Amino acid sequence: MTEGNFVDYTKIYVSSGKGGKGSTHLHREKFIEKGGPDGGDGGRGGHVYLVGEKSLWTLFHLKFARHVKAGHGGDGGSSRSTGSDGEDKYIEVPLGTVVRDKETNEILFEITEHGEKRIIAEGGKGGLGNWHFRSSTNQTPRYSQPGLPAQEADIVLELKVLADVGLVGFPNAGKSTLLSVLTSAKPKIADYPFTTLKPNLGIVAYRDYQSFVIADIPGIIEGAAEGKGLGHYFLRHIERNSTLLFLVPADADDIKKEYDILLDELRRYNPEMLDKDRLIVVSKCDMLDEELQVEMKKQLDKDFAGIPYLFISSIAQQGLVELKDKLWAMLNVEA
């Protein structure tokens, strides 16, 4: 998906460098009639690496980098001199990048840590020079090894946002507003569906200089698991979150029904998502008088037995401290 500078999916072709060939040079020196072999080895071809970079949050910088090629190894020289190694290429990617084989769709590896470095195309080994092939029966071998060929790969890079908490809800549930009051993030906010067309991340400052990361996942609609709307482009970002915050507005026609639809979309996309911790948050509680809120709590106790829920108002700044406390406790249950 692409929106502005946010790109979370791209395809690139990578090629390492081929190894340099070994030399067949024979030693030549004044007054020495028959010099022995002194051909050096070829240099290694350049590798292509993927490197995790925490300051990146998009694959936009690779949008037009369709072909990344490392340098070839240099040929061996005389006096057993080894050829130069080919130039390595480093492709920086954001944390949470999944690397797939384009043809088979097999996951090759994932980049999840800053500075993590993985070879995606290994440079060819340099060939051996003729010096290695001298023997008692062949004092002047005139052959050497060629360098090994380069490796090529068509790969798919797919970004899955790394966050502790994922905000899940229908379009216009108030997720962007909640993110803006909990964090310093400034997501686009307006009163129409699909205001958010990319995941927005924010850092929630907690007590004693602690913090956690929360992601506003673009609004899910019924049928998202089958690709309706923007489908799996949104849903895959939720896979990384350890805790899911289901945000449902207090003025929803049926809070339980909205929650069930959201949960069913996650289940159909990936049943393992149901193993994550869940918190139901009823937003816009400033619209409720005290009596109505009491009645609603009674109904929620029946509908969501065993699942924690909270009432908040982002606009009125109600229940936000309790929300932070609850999320922190859920994220640090084993601490």
Curated annotation (Swiss-Prot):
Role description: An essential GTPase which binds GTP, GDP and possibly (p)ppGpp with moderate affinity, with high nucleotide exchange rates and a fairly low GTP hydrolysis rate. Plays a role in control of the cell cycle, stress response, ribosome biogenesis and in those bacteria that undergo differentiation, in morphogenesis control.
Residues annotated as domain OBG-type G: 163-332
The name this protein goes by in its record: GTPase Obg
UniProt-listed Enzyme Commission number(s): 3.6.5.-
Domain Obg: 4-162
Residues where GTP binds: 169-176, 194-198, 216-219, 283-286, 313-315
Keywords: Cytoplasm, GTP-binding, Hydrolase, Magnesium, Metal-binding, Nucleotide-binding
PROSITE patterns xrefs: G_OBG, GTP1_OBG, OBG
Source organism (scientific name): Flavobacterium psychrophilum (strain ATCC 49511 / DSM 21280 / CIP 103535 / JIP02/86)
Subcellular location: Cytoplasm
Gene3D superfamilies, alphabetized: GTP1/OBG domain (2.70.210.12), P-loop containing nucleotide triphosphate hydrolases (3.40.50.300)
Assembly, per entry: Monomer.
Entry annotated with the keyword Nucleotide-binding: yes
Family named by the database record: Belongs to the TRAFAC class OBG-HflX-like GTPase superfamily. OBG GTPase family.
Entries under NCBIfam families matching the protein: Obg_CgtA, PRK12297.1, PRK12299.1
Pfam families per record: GTP1_OBG (PF01018), MMR_HSR1 (PF01926)
UniProt cofactor(s): Mg(2+)
Broadest EC class assigned to this enzyme: hydrolase
Molecular function per GO: GTP binding; GTPase activity; magnesium ion binding
Residues annotated for Mg(2+) binding in this entry: S176, T196
Main location: cytoplasm
Gene Ontology cellular component annotations, sorted alphabetically: cytoplasm
